[in-house]
Amino acid sequence: MNLNFMPLLHAYNHASIDFHFNSSARDFCVHEVPLYEFSNTGEHAVIQVRKSGLSTLEMLHIFSQILGLKIAELGYAGLKDKNALTTQFISLPKKYAPLLEKNTSNFQERNLKILSLNYHHNKIKLGHLKGNRFFMRFKKMTPLNAQKTEQVLEQIAQFGMPNYFGSQRFGKFNDNHKEGLKILQNETKFAHQKLNAFLISSYQSYLFNALLSKRLEISKIISDFSLKENLEFFKQKNLSVNSNTLKALKNQDHPFKILEGDVMCHYPYGKFFDALELEKEGERFLKKEAAPTGLLDGKKALYAKNLSLEIEKEFQHNLLNSHAKTLGSRRFFWVFAENITSQYMKEKAQFELGFYLPKGSYASALLKEIKHEEGENNDEF
């Protein structure tokens, strides 16, 4: 497989939209939505913290220094962007709670503010969030481009968007995934296990993005070409598809086609199941009740079947038989942005956008789908 970066396909077919977005505390805000309500009782204090100009790990170091506790005693659900105004929840042993108010000024000097204090019976762990609410301000937006943006947002609100990984995880030179492959092939290894795991996950992410882009390509071909042309295309690709199956695929109203054997998952979370009845699963996808998933390969990964597996095989690459303890999983191919709000201010040439995404999905994927900008940037937020 060619590991060089290729342009990732977009879901919708509009021309590129020109505007300026700066990932900064003024123009980009992220608010974490917790997975569960806090009980207001228990051995763990839970604080909602607002930060700017700090990564989550930098924030944890500040709490460790000021309160005199170990970083391992702090719990958090996910990493938040440094170049943004963000709120998130962190937990710490209850005995440190009295020190929080005493050190208010110390926190404020470090661009931190504690917004609320609660208690709970367990420590917050990675993944203990429902999702995030986002605010983005676009600048240098013309009225025509604002109108185009609204049209794209209508499509995203109706059909959703590709759940691409942002390119930040691939590194400044877009080569983290190549290092991950070298680790899997036992050609290199770093002293820090977390770095090895991160580089391997970069390789998994690269394969996922490539598979998702391939599926988008196939979906567009199914939609845009005749039955005869589709049969010829699949024949050339050595993919087993008959005319009845192709008719069923063309009848799906969603731009991303559900293939026989896709591993579906109840949305936004739930059990995995196989897509065997295309009409039924296509309707559930349109209703946002379930969505197809893509492979993050590994030793215990759940694989697709039938036609979906024939396509997926190309991206089952060197992980299954690797020495590395990479378990693998599935990730939604497609996600649905919710509570989309927008406002265009013509006199300022600014466009304000708000929306919610489930955990594991990135605002940069929505930005990519709106702009249709050529090439990749290094944003993952």
Question: Model segments located where?
Answer:
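Non-catalytic, substrate/partner-engaging modules appended to enzymatic cores
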Residues: 1-381
